[in-house]
Design a protein with these regions (language model features):
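Loop-to-transmembrane helix entry
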Residues: 4, 30-45, 211-216, 236-259, ...
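Intracellular juxtamembrane helix-capping segments at the cytosolic ends
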Residues: 23, 107-122, 235, 318-336
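Central cavity-lining transmembrane alpha-helices of secondary-active solute carriers
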Residues: 40-61, 255-266
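C-terminal ends and interior cores of transmembrane alpha-helices
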Residues: 75-92, 265-268, 284-301
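Hydrophobic core of transmembrane alpha-helices in multi-pass small-molecule transporters
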Residues: 84, 93-109, 302-322
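Glycine-rich segments within core transmembrane alpha-helices of 12-TM secondary carriers
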Residues: 123-150, 166-167, 345-359
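Intracellular loop-helix junctions on the cytosolic face of multi-pass helical membrane proteins
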Residues: 149-217, 241, 270-272, 398-412
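PAS/LOV and related PAS-like sensory modules
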Residues: 415-430
Length: 430
């Protein structure tokens, strides 16, 4: 079951990346659009579509019933591929607008795919397999894009549609496979809490109930998503690829994937949900602190391109994937929350992609001629500091909140037992 479900989820989202991210391998050198850098504008337009999908998804994913998931997947991937064909057909710069619909169609796919595997005793393993698709797929998408352009000599505008055409039928087949997964058992529900849809009132109540820690996590994730998007979309501008294989990205991301798989794999042996939350956040703090140190001391450390990219990728993805895979599933189970992981993931993504658009627009309008490496290192350094503080505070809050709720549960149990004894004595003959 684990290989079936986890493998299908991993491959499914990897193919979503094949429909969404290959264009990032192209540099579009010398192209401008409406007075702005062409690639920056393509990225902003696609993210705007993605952003709107995330906003709609806060409601849609929270309420999406299981019988409608497959229809949603099929409609999304068909629109995504059609938009890539239009990107190749239409003349630049007007083809940019096709990428808006590409982002719009794929913005909720993570939440939909995750809904197939959440709320199970095996979710930690399944989510780990699913989550690594983000790491490995990003590098593979760029490497395949470079291969198609450099070896097959396909143009920058048609390369995404060609890759998407191969991905679409495979993704439809995997969607069907996920849709055939059995529902969580009663034992799954007992250990991980039943996953239910949330209406607007319930979403607001959930946020109010955990507002301090959710604000900390949402703000920190806002910064992480911005940093990850800039790294993924502009890596070919950040580092000098001359002298390196076009498969460098895939090779580094594969090693990072194996390390994170091993780290997150240890969580399977920890039954206590609060212990898992503390361990995960501690790993995240170590990652963000390392990321900040390496970035702010880039000139002093004199690291090679490969070493720098490996450390950045590992540190960033430990933090990012923690919240995209395991954290909220354990959070729901720990505090017996009635809800689903999709609500949390779509919310943090919506907030994060909003930040990405604002940062790119600020860069384009106020500082168009920048050194991408310096820009990234400065941002990575300060993001690392802020996130280290935010996640450390989150650990303190969660531990204290859990202790408080355990005391309340113990108190209620004692009261109920006392009432039962009193009732028993009251019916005894005098």
């Amino acid at each position: 079951f684990i290989l079936w479900a986890g493998g299908a989820a991993l491959l499914s989202y990897s193919l979503v990346y094949a429909l969404r991210k290959p264009f990032t391998a192209a540099s579009f050198d010398g192209l401008d659009a409406f007075g702005l850098d062409y690639k920056v504008l393509v990225t902003i337009v696609q993210i705007l579509g993605y952003l709107i999908a995330k906003f709609v998804g806060i409601k849609l994913i929270s309420e999406l019933k299981k019988e409608h998931r497959m229809k949603f997947i099929l409609a999304s991937i068909l629109v995504a591929e059609l938009s890539l064909v239009l990107f190749g057909l239409l003349p630049a710069p007007y083809n940019i607008f096709a990428m808006f619909f590409n982002g719009l169609s794929l913005g909720c796919m993570w939440g939909v795919i995750f809904s197939f595997i959440e709320g199970r005793r095996t979710t930690d393993i399944l989510a780990r397999l699913f989550g690594i698709s983000i790491i490995i797929s990003s590098g593979v998408a760029k490497s395949i894009g470079l291969f198609v352009m450099n070896t097959l000599h396909v143009g920058e505008f048609w390369m995404p549609a060609l890759i998407g055409a191969f991905a679409l039928p495979l993704l439809a087949l995997l969607g069907y496979t996920l849709n055939r997964l059995p529902q969580p058992t009663q034992q799954d529900i007992a250990e991980k809490s039943q996953r239910v849809t949330l209406n607007g009132k319930q979403r607001k109540e959930l946020f109010r109930n955990f507002m301090p820690v959710l604000i900390l996590l949402f703000v920190a994730n806002l910064l992480l998503v911005i940093l990850r998007d800039i790294k993924e979309d502009f890596l070919v501008k950040i580092i000098d690829m001359s002298g390196h294989s076009s498969w460098l990205f895939a090779q580094i991301d594969s090693v990072v994937t194996l390390i994170i798989l091993a780290l997150f794999g240890m969580m399977v042996f920890v039954k206590s949900n609060i212990k898992v939350l503390v361990i995960l956040l501690s790993m995240v703090v170590a990652g963000t602190a390392t990321m900040s140190f390496v970035s702010l001391n880039y000139d002093t450390l004199q690291l090679s391109t490969v070493t720098w990219l490996f450390i950045q990728s590992l540190s960033l993805y430990i933090a990012y994937l923690c919240f995209q895979s395991i954290f909220f599933d354990r959070f729901i189970a720990c505090f017996k929350i009635k809800g689903n992981v999709g609500f949390f993931i779509v919310t943090i993504d919506f907030i994060g992609y909003t930040g990405t658009v604002l940062v790119l627009m600020f860069k384009e309008f106020f500082n168009t001629d920048i050194n991408w490496l310096d820009f990234y290192n400065q941002m990575s350094g300060y993001v690392g500091i802020i996130c280290t503080v935010a996640f450390s505070c989150s650990i303190v809050y969660l531990v204290q909140r859990h202790k408080k709720e355990e005391l309340l549960r113990t108190g209620r149990a004692v009261e109920e037992k006392s009432e039962m004894l009193q009732s028993a004595f009251s019916v005894m003959p005098s």
